[in-house]
Regions:
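Gly/Thr-rich phosphate-binding beta-strand-loop-beta motif of the actin/hexokinase/Hsp70
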Residues: 1-33, 136-168, 185, 215-231
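Conserved phosphate-binding loops in N-terminal lobes of ATP-dependent enzymes
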Residues: 12-99, 226, 230
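Phosphate-binding glycine-rich/basic clefts of nucleotide- and phosphate-handling proteins
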Residues: 159-245, 275-280
Length: 448
């Protein structure tokens, strides 16, 4: 009996479906350590234990391949990952639809198809993720596809014409993905553990692995709870820290704001629906950020693009040896109600920060905190009056229920990439950059 499957690719990993169910999810991780190999979930769950032997960038780098500059080691890792996936799902599969993100270059797609041919994967069609999103019935605004992956985010504006979706504009953010988001969240939680227990989870491989394995659950809990109870096991002891959900979520605000700014840049005067991975909403509360700016959000579940590809199978399947990327398809119309606009996320609550996070150390603000520049030490935070404090670059001061940042001596100070001329009110999650320093300071809340 012949069967058809769809393989959904991005640099987070590989998802495989048939027409009726999810068959496999394999994260884009490989560990090769002294002859021992782990691929997919087994590798991801050991990534912090073997940081030098773990690779999770091969899909990302293959996707960005340029002509005459294909990294063969990345291609070999993609081949090994796909071979592992194909071995598990190939039984009776005689036809495969690939769905791919906007991040793939033509060269990257060519290498990918060559790898599929080498593995005897019978690819019959290849579809751009964005054109698989649903069209909302009786809706005339913008439809935007947001594809957050492990190391990057692709944002695609769709054009609708004659009941078809086609790719109009693509914006790429190579510095925002789940990897950078998890790292930011892990550093915040680690600082809370240090303050509460003196245990630094980032300085022990097994502890760090525990932390990263727990992050998705803790981030989800932070969307509905005021505080998250985090536990780690170390040397037969249990260490516990209560993490303020507001601070944890707000610490990711700068990254989400970059995404929102791109969504608004398309046409802020029109209504917009953003179709996003369910994970970005469940773990980061993306809907509340988007809703605050009038953008509705449609959540796409795991393997959504693979599932939707079956609606177009008869139209796109080709017996021709040549397979081309399909970037235009008839719209699949939804009759569900429009997504609702809400604005009740914990992340939007303005709470007062208690500490400044700088170089992995949390400095208490108390009543006043001076940022000074010391030759040989670079930046230093002080909460007492000193000779250096008289020439402070900036001052963070509590004033009744507000937390204010005051600029001194004509320094260039930016809060969330916006230059501050004299003073400004600041909140949990705000990021401060000073003059030409690469390091940033982040306002956080640490439970006492």
């Amino acid at each position: 009996m012949c069967s058809q499957i769809a393989i959904e690719l991005n640099d987070t990993g590989v998802t495989v479906r048939d027409e009726f169910q999810l068959l496999l999810e394999s994260p884009g991780y490989i560990i090769d350590c002294s002859g021992q190999e782990w691929i997919g979930k087994e590798a991801r769950d050991r990534a912090q234990l073997f940081p030098n032997e773990c690779n999770n960038r091969f899909w990302f780098e293959l996707a960005q391949s340029q002509a005459n500059a294909v990294n063969q080691s990345n291609a070999k890792l993609v081949l090994r990952h796909l071979a592992s996936v194909w071995q598990q799902v190939s039984s009776n599969a005689t036809s495969v639809i690939l769905t791919v993100p906007a991040t793939f270059t033509k060269t990257g797609l060519g290498v990918l198809l060559g790898i599929c041919k080498q593995l005897a994967i019978p690819v019959r069609a290849m579809i751009h993720h964005a054109v698989l999103v649903p069209r909302q019935s009786d809706y005339t605004g913008l439809t935007i596809h947001l594809d957050m992956q492990l190391h990057q985010t692709a944002i695609t504006l769709l054009q609708e014409r004659n009941d078809e979706f086609s790719v109009s504009t693509v914006e790429l953010l190579d510095d925002i993905g789940f990897a950078s988001i998890y790292t930011t969240a892990a550093e915040y939680i680690a600082q809370v553990f240090i303050s509460a227990t003196r245990l630094d989870p980032m300085h022990d491989a097994e502890l760090e692995q525990q932390l990263f394995n727990s992050l998705p659950v803790w981030l989800e809990q932070a969307q509905s709870q005021g505080a998250v109870q985090c536990r780690l096991q170390y040397q037969n002891n249990t260490y516990e820290a209560i993490v303020d959900a507001h601070g944890l979520i707000a610490g990711l605000k700068l990254k989400l704001n970059k995404i929102i700014n791109i969504l608004l840049s398309f046409d802020s005067k029109q209504a917009a629906i953003a179709c996003v991975p369910e994970m970005i909403d469940k773990q980061l509360g993306f809907s509340s950020y988007a809703n605050k700016h009038g953008i509705m959000v449609r959540r796409l579940g795991l393997g959504y693009h693979a599932q939707q590809s079956f609606l177009h199978a008869k139209q796109v399947i080709s017996n021709d040896a040549q397979v081309y990327l399909i970037k235009q398809l008839p719209c699949a119309t939804l009759t569900d109600p429009l997504p609702r606009l809400t604005n009740n996320s914990l992340a939007t609550s303005h709470q007062q920060a208690t500490h400044v996070l700088y170089n992995h150390r949390a400095y208490p603000i108390e009543d006043i905190l001076y940022l000074v520049e010391i030759i040989g030490v670079e930046l230093q935070l002080q909460n007492h009056q000193s000779s250096e404090a008289q020439n402070a670059l900036l001052v963070i001061r509590k004033k009744s229920s507000q937390l204010l940042i005051e600029i001194t001596n004509g320094n260039c100070i930016k809060v969330n990439d916006q230059e501050i001329k004299s003073y400004a009110q600041v909140f949990i999650g705000d990021c401060i950059r000073v003059n030409d320093y690469e390091e940033q300071l982040m306002l956080i809340k640490v439970e006492q």
